[in-house]
């Protein structure tokens, strides 16, 4: 099958999938305020819906392609009607949310209600098409279509703040999303027709009686038949889950930390999510696969640098140091984790299970960082926890035999990982020792801390300060 049509269908589906995320966030902000928690809880909801979409794709992929097309088209028609109904009713229900005592749960409910069905169906997009290709004679390079999917996601994410939100009303945006679903449904139907025709035609070597030409899930074939290490898929299944969970936990933790210490403005959230997607695009390629080890080294260097910076308290230092270092750690960590994830990919026959476990890890990591962490931590401890997790995973990566680690001295990497762990733990102890009282809710974290302050006469006195992130709201000399 020619790759142009599947690639266009995957690109458009991913474009719509990530275009609706900031659009839904924009819809909810007037009701819940501009706090970063609105966005991070939305991310957790999106990651959970992504899991539902991958599970749906995994289950229906066992059916014939024609049956899959009919079922998916029927559900897409329902999603179009659902989205159109919401576009009409949105002004009427706009003021009915945001007044409960559980805003996080209410945001989750709104995401499920407003965009749950179309999001689940769009989430299944790339997995379904790749599964169709894997069953045809044109199964080479199916995993690289995942990079096309992430490119579409990145374009959809950037298009919203630059081209859509400033010029199009919110109601028109939702109608445009419904129209996009219709176009996507047509493309998906045609892709399914070609996949079914190719499989049932006489061009497939698997249907010509040449059994040896048909790769089995455990066979080492082309670069996309198994991971580069040639390890059976079952032995790597836990890694698919853990690496995805770690990367999503990192994304949400960095977003919360930078939004709390700088300012919770939506463009920063989109930039961070865009960087996360770029790491997927770069990692799911031959370059990302070969360079995973070096990205692990850069990740450790970034963690060490950020651990030093976490001791700084001045707001100007926060903006000029925390922001670039936080972005760098997110990029380096994403390239490392996703490159490792690509290296341990299974044969195409097992790709729906692979993506299902990736989505499950993402959902668990997202919910842990944005929903569970605020409930159990009085401060933003999820950020140093994410840094510790990166350091430990980097040490584990270099403890495993892998061609990508050749040329790197493992002992030096383990030493660097140990330094990173000691610095992060030391920073956590230092911050905990300063805090007298900390309170955290959906809208942020406030701390009463011991500090020093210089008087107008130049004297340095001990004091207590009330802070929200790096912003000091008041000082009392002791």
List each language-model region with its residue ranges.
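Alpha-helical transmembrane segments of multi-pass membrane proteins
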Residues: 1-207, 217-478
